[in-house]
Amino acid sequence: MQTDNTKSNTNKTAKQEWGSFAFVICIALLIRILIMEPFTVPTGSMKATILENDYIFSTKYSYGYSNYSLSFFDFIPLFKGRIFAREPERGDIVVFRPPNDMNVRYIKRLIGLPGDKIQLIDDVIYINDKKIERTEVGTYISEEGIKYLKFKETLPNGRTYFSYKLAPIFGVIYNDRYGNTDVFYVPEGKYFFLGDNRDQSNDSRVNLGFVPFENFIAKAQFIWLSTKITWWDNDIGVINLVLKLKPWIESVRLNRIFRNLYSTDE
């Protein structure tokens, strides 16, 4: 009889533990789906605001919810448009699905709102025929030793941020077609994005085009971790992952941890 009671108590405890574990998993999934989601940035299109292998904390609720912003369900057409929608602001850094490749995620700065007229002339942004404030404030040398000119830009709503342009080499300007564009008329329900790394960004000036509001996933807020190298790789196997762990930890950029993406402090 004592043995049966012991088994019963053990089974009850195991069920309680599994129930608690399942509850925690459900809460974590709900947080990721509805509140926040971490992203890793693989490219330098937002350099030096965001570097390769920056780990970004983003808020899912900032713009409401669409089929594309609901993690794990974005492949199911649950509904169209957005629910609990909040209007994005000029200068926001947004994670979104590019309309020409729904299998990836981009992160760019929102420059043009629906109805805007956008053009770049000599690298200066013109919004509705008015140029934004743009001042050269210094230079930036990347980890690869590449020199960039650093500019402080101010949008019409007062949002300020830094943009970067490859420094001329022997007087030659790199990729000048990015700095002098056609006129873009932003359609209703769509937005115009630029990368802060102006010469090395696939954005609304080139292949990306305009981005529908429905494609917005989250608003990027701050960097919670940053490393010089990537650790996880599905192709290298468990042993190599273990061997790579130490150099990955040693590559952490301590000065970037918990950096606010909207701060213009030097």
Swiss-Prot record:
It is a single-pass type II membrane protein. It is found in: Cell inner membrane. One of its GO terms (molecular function) is serine-type endopeptidase activity. CDD domains: S26_SPase_I. GO terms for cellular component: plasma membrane. Its EC number is 3.4.21.89. Residues 1-20 are cytoplasmic. It comes from Rickettsia felis (strain ATCC VR-1525 / URRWXCal2). It comes from the Bacteria. Residues 42-266 are periplasmic. The active site is at residues 45, 108. It catalyses: Cleavage of hydrophobic, N-terminal signal or leader sequences from secreted and periplasmic proteins. The chain crosses the membrane at residues 21-41. The keyword Ion transport does not apply. It holds the Pfam family Peptidase_S26. Belongs to the peptidase S26 family. Keywords: Cell inner membrane, Cell membrane, Hydrolase, Membrane, Transmembrane, Transmembrane helix. SUPFAM superfamilies: LexA/Signal peptidase (SSF51306). GO terms for biological process: signal peptide processing. This is Signal peptidase I.
